[in-house]
């Protein structure tokens, strides 16, 4: 399982952004106009899109993404996505990897918010205006609407295929109305995020903050083998400030490459960006 990491441009855009479209967040396809050639949920997968030359199914060529049939009656195709957690989307990546003669020439992204999930009552706002798309490429686009949303509608013109859709942003959880007394403050779904690290050569660094146990050795944070003095580090921003009562460090599936030991430091700051990142970040060692 090869997990896709954000393009370099996305990482430079802002530390701490998470992919709100990830199934890890509980995000699902709500509805779709047409996914005859390739089912829409594939578009949200965390894995790197692949091309398998000799793979076909009952409807034709198998593609790793969402692909609609060819339109003959005008109009355009769309896909509505229900976010697992409400959030503010700051950057969108429409990836047409491996779609060369069947990519959509254009796309537009709209967003909305619904308390009851009734699509018919949603007021849609433009997140990304109509843009031209190219074949087999990332299309990184800055958001035009920076308010909390939980529904996203990807419109493609007129039809075609999208390998992956990434919605980078911040989780917006209403902590004032939570019923539980204990929370996993570092979880992605709680608004936790990775602010920085010295190395993440293998695996998926965001899996470190995902719910449940890792599925394989690739479903976690792993650094390259260190040949020089020092140690590896990662900085996590919690979803909200709080008191840490218990910490779990799970090395599931890491057998010959688990860390010998670790240490954890805590820090309270109103702006992590002002503190800098790295082993000298400071804080209280626990």
State where each predicted segment sits.
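Conserved small/polar residues in nucleotide/adenosyl-binding loops
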Residues: 268-273
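Edge beta-strands of jelly-roll/beta-sandwich modules across compartments, strongly enriched
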Residues: 160-170
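A short beta-strand element within beta-rich, extracytoplasmic domains
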Residues: 88-98, 154, 244-253
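Disordered, acidic Ser/Thr/Pro-rich linker "stalks" and the adjacent N-terminal cap
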Residues: 1-78, 82, 100, 168-239, ...
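Short, surface-exposed beta-strand/strand-loop-strand elements in extracellular ectodomains
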Residues: 103-111, 259-266
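Short loop/turn segments immediately following beta-strands, especially the blade-tip
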Residues: 114-117
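Beta-sandwich interaction modules
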Residues: 128-160
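Hydrophobic alpha-helical segments, chiefly the membrane-spanning helices
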Residues: 280-286
């Amino acid at each position: 399982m090869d997990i896709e990491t954000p393009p370099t441009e996305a990482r430079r855009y802002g530390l701490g952004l998470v992919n709100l479209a990830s199934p890890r967040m509980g995000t699902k396809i709500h509805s779709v106009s047409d996914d005859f050639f390739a089912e829409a949920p594939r578009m949200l997968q965390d894995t790197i899109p692949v091309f398998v030359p000799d793979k076909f199914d009952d409807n034709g060529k198998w593609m790793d993404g969402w692909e609609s049939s060819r339109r003959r009656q005008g109009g355009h195709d769309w896909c509505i996505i229900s976010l697992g957690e409400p959030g503010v989307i700051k950057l969108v990546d429409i990836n047409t990897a491996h779609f060369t003669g069947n990519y959509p020439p254009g796309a537009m992204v709209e967003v909305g918010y619904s308390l009851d999930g009734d699509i018919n009552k949603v007021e849609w706002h433009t997140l990304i205006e109509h843009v031209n798309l190219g074949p087999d490429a990332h299309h990184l686009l800055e958001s035009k609407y920076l308010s909390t949303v939980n529904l996203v509608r990807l419109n493609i013109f007129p039809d075609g295929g999208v390998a992956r859709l990434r919605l980078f942003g911040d989780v917006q959880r209403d902590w004032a109305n939570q019923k539980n007394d204990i929370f996993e403050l570092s979880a992605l779904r709680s608004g936790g995020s990775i602010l920085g690290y010295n190395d993440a050569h293998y695996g998926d660094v965001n899996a470190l903050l995902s719910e449940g146990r890792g599925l394989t050795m690739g479903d976690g944070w792993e650094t390259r083998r260190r040949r020089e003095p020092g140690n590896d580090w990662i900085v996590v921003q919690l979803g909200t400030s709080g008191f840490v009562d218990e910490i779990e460090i799970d090395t599931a599936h890491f057998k010959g490459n688990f860390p010998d030991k670790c240490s954890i430091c805590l820090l309270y700051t109103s702006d992590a960006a002002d503190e800098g990142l790295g082993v000298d970040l400071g804080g209280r060692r626990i």
